[in-house]
Amino acid sequence: MSKKKTNPNKIRIAENSFDSQKIIADLVGKMVLRAWLLVLGALADFAETTPKSIEALWTEVNAFADIIHDSNHVSKSIKHLKKITGVSIPYEQLSTKQIKTKGDLDKFTRHANERALYIALATISGAIAEKTLLCEENSSLVFRKAFALNDEVIENRISLLDIQNMLEDEYSVCMYQVNGLMKLRIKPAI
């Protein structure tokens, strides 16, 4: 007879048994990578996308993203992303005060993942808008496609590795992390 699975909402956890800052730090890098893969995957639908244009966009957005990390810019970027996509983006503060069970911790982690992804997408879209790297119509198309790709990833119809492989095959572009920092490498043409 198989053992019955324990409900995670009934598994009590001690307040000091988890480090919320470490959880957030670990997932931020993953979600920034995911956001970039979604955006670059969406850009692949445009005929004018080239390795050089991807590298130029990457360079401009990263230079600008270093400047706009305060909450005012993030709020402005979230409003812009909502305007161009019609997607409502939750931006509530996360609290660890309600975490009493394993289920609560799982819920906190899910919300932190979503929030980190939305902030990363908003930061990228805000930089694109501020620097006018894409016209608003193309920006809207790119981010709607990025959200659609994210839905496909959630539904396991495609994977982030599929997007990464497509970028490598079609554009010789490789995304990776080093010590929590995102890197873009364009492989030289043979």
Positions of PLM-derived features:
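Amphipathic alpha-helical segments that form the core helices of the histone-fold
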Residues: L57-I68, V142-V153
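A structural feature that tracks compact, well-ordered secondary-structure segments
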Residues: A129-E130, S139-R144
